[in-house]
Amino acid sequence: MKRTFQPSTIKRARTHGFRARMATKNGRAVLSRRRAKGRKRLTV
């Protein structure tokens, strides 16, 4: 049986990246929450 996690930087950025977050209203909400919390890294 193969492992389920097969890392890919492109897929990672496309789903969880900054531009992906900015594309939707909820994504922008995620960023604002992370800014409010004081996260050093907002996205991957």
Curated annotation (Swiss-Prot):
Sample GO molecular function, one term: structural constituent of ribosome
Disulfide bond annotation, renumbered to this chain: none
Pfam families registered for this protein in UniProt: Ribosomal_L34
Keyword set includes Ligase: no
Superkingdom per UniProt: Bacteria
GO biological process, one term: translation
GO annotation, cellular component aspect: ribonucleoprotein complex; ribosome
Keywords assigned by UniProt, alphabetized: Ribonucleoprotein, Ribosomal protein
Keyword Coiled coil: no
PROSITE patterns assigned: RIBOSOMAL_L34
Family stated for the protein in its record: Belongs to the bacterial ribosomal protein bL34 family.
PANTHER family xref list: LARGE RIBOSOMAL SUBUNIT PROTEIN BL34M, MITOCHONDRIAL RIBOSOMAL PROTEIN 34 FAMILY MEMBER
Name of protein: Large ribosomal subunit protein bL34
Gene this protein is translated from: rpmH
